[in-house]
Each structure stands twice: as C-alpha cells, then as structure tokens.
Amino acid sequence: MKYRIFSLFYIAIVFVTQMAAENGSHLWLRLPANAHAEISAPRQSPTLNIAVEELHQAWQGAPVQLVIQRDKQLQPEGFRIRHEDNKITLTSPTETGLLYAAYHLLRMQATGQNVTATQTTENPAYSLRILNHWDNMDRTVERGYAGQSLWNWEELPNTLSDRYKEYARANASIGINGTVLNNVNASPQILSTEYLQKVKALADIFRPYGLRVYLSVNFASPMALDSLSTADPLDKKVISWWKHKDKEIYRIIPDFGGFLVKANSEGQPGPCDFGRTHAEGANMLADALKPYKGIVMWRAFVYSPSDADRAKQAYLEFEPLDGQFRNNVIVQVKTGPMDFQRR
C-alpha cells in the first residue's frame, strides 16, 4: 500500500513539474534542439542568420541551401522549396521570404509531411499581414483577457524583455509582417520624441524577423503635443506639423509602416470636428507619409450614440467618399457592423 501511494505521489510530482514547465510561450515552435543540420546561405545578415540558426537547431533532414533568386512566379515574400540530389533548396527573392521558407520547412517536419515528395511553392495572399494590438501605455489592454501588455513602456528603451524577440519569432513563423503596437483609442504621447525612441527599440528587435511597426495615432495630436489651435486637415500649419513629425519618425525608424486612425467615433477626434470629411483627413496623413512609402489605415467603424443603427451610419458616411481616398489609404472595415462578429 505504501509503495502504491509513493508511486502515485511520484507520478503526480512529475506531472505537475511538466505542467509548470509548459507555459505555452513556444506556441507551435516546440522544435527539436541541437539537430546540427548542414545549412548554407549566400551571405550573413540578421535575417538570414536567424533562418540558418532555426534550421541548424531543429531540421533533421537532408542538407539545406538558402538561395536568393528572382523568380517571376514568386512575390517578394514568396518562396520555393525543392528537394533533389539529396539536398533541399529554399529560394526566394528576399531574405524575409527565405526566413518564411525555413519556418515552412520546419512546419512540414513537425506535421509529418513528406518533404521529398513534391516541390512546394508559396506566395502570400495578402501583402500586408498586420496584427492590431489594443494595448494602452499604462500596460492595460482594452478587451484584454490575458494579463498586461507585452510592451513595458516605463522600462523601454533601456530594458528589453526576452519576450519581444519571442513575439517577433512567433509572428515570423506564421508570416505576420506588421504590428500596430497601441490601442486605436490612442494617446497623443505615442508620437512624442521620448516614446518614438521606445518604439525604435522594439522596431530594432522586430526588423530581422520581417516585422514592421505601425502606430495608432490621435488625430488631434498637433493640438495636444504642440498646442496648435486646430487639427483641421486642410490647415497649412497642421499639414506642416504632420510632415515634420513623419520626417522625425522615419529618421528614427526608417522602415516604419504607417498609421492606424480611429477618428470621429466613440468620442475620438477627427476631421469631421472641423467640417472636413474622412477622406480629407485620411488623405492629409497619407500625403505626409507618401515620400516614405507609409500607409494610413483609416477605420470605417464610426458611429454616433444618437443613432442606434451603426451599420447604416458607417455606410452613409463612407459610401459617398468612394474613390476619393489616396492610393496609400486603406479604409479598414470590421468583419461586421458590430464588434466581434465572425466572418
């Protein structure tokens, strides 16, 4: 009887220990370690070094060669996996594409697919694959049910959590290439020089993983940060303010992606406060970003509490503006007219 109790106790301890060791942070990347695979790349770079190291540690098959090569059938982040002569070749026009190829090869191994059977060609269905965080600067998360925000703004840029790299790795492993760091109910402070340096610290970690940073911005930021008397998108001083701010941003973060804007909805300021349309507001921001190839994601989920039909309101505001937005503006609609509807 004592032996049976001891055995059950021992099993329970082992089980609990294993449970404690698994915190879910590795997601699908629970990969073999120290496989010491033979991997070659055309050169060294932060991105290629990651691809080589991931394969070197976890790939258990034939030698792998990474090749940067133009291919009319491949988009910039597309890739091809080919097996011949007991060697696997990964090709892509870009380093990021090769990183995606490396993760795809490891995914095929993890799911038991026969890598030697066929040639694999992959192209992304969407060029922009962006996560939108609803994280506030005090680390609370709107509609967040899993603890505090990853971004510890008080400690940035001097203290860099290991979780930032793990976050970038997880995103790259499934092809995510952009992230909006902050809540659409944005604080103007995110555009201050102090906070742009904090954003830079994250962008520098994310960059080798092909992950670009975007920010939600408050439309009235010129009034909040520099005491302008207006945020009218047709006012020359306002236009100049955004141009100078964008110049500062791209000096600090050269590959910055652009802005996400929630305007004239749920109390947020916007162009309609100054008698302007959503198109005029979005286009002003887009023109300032255009020299840097940045984009504006302008939310179409807008409504006033005075009208219960939210779907109708959004339609009435945006349908007449069809065709008036700049080419680097994306009018971002929700899956449905209300929050959290399934596609």
Describe each PLM feature range.
Residues 51-54, 74-78, 83-260, 290:
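Feature activates predominantly on carbohydrate-active enzymes
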Residues 35-39, 129-131, 177-179, 259, ...:
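Hydrophobic beta-strand segments of well-ordered beta-sheets in folded domains
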Residues 42, 68-69, 92-93, 182-184, ...:
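Active-site-proximal beta-strand/loop segments in catalytic clefts of secreted hydrolases
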Residues 56-63, 110-111, 203-210, 283-296, ...:
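Structural alpha-beta junctions
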Residues 46, 90, 187-191, 268-273:
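A generic structural signal for short coil/turn motifs at secondary-structure boundaries
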Residues 10-85, 93-96, 115-119:
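Acidic, contiguous N-terminal accessory segments
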Residues 227-343:
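Catalytic-core regions of glycoside hydrolase
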Residues 1-9:
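Bacterial N-terminal signal peptides that target proteins for export
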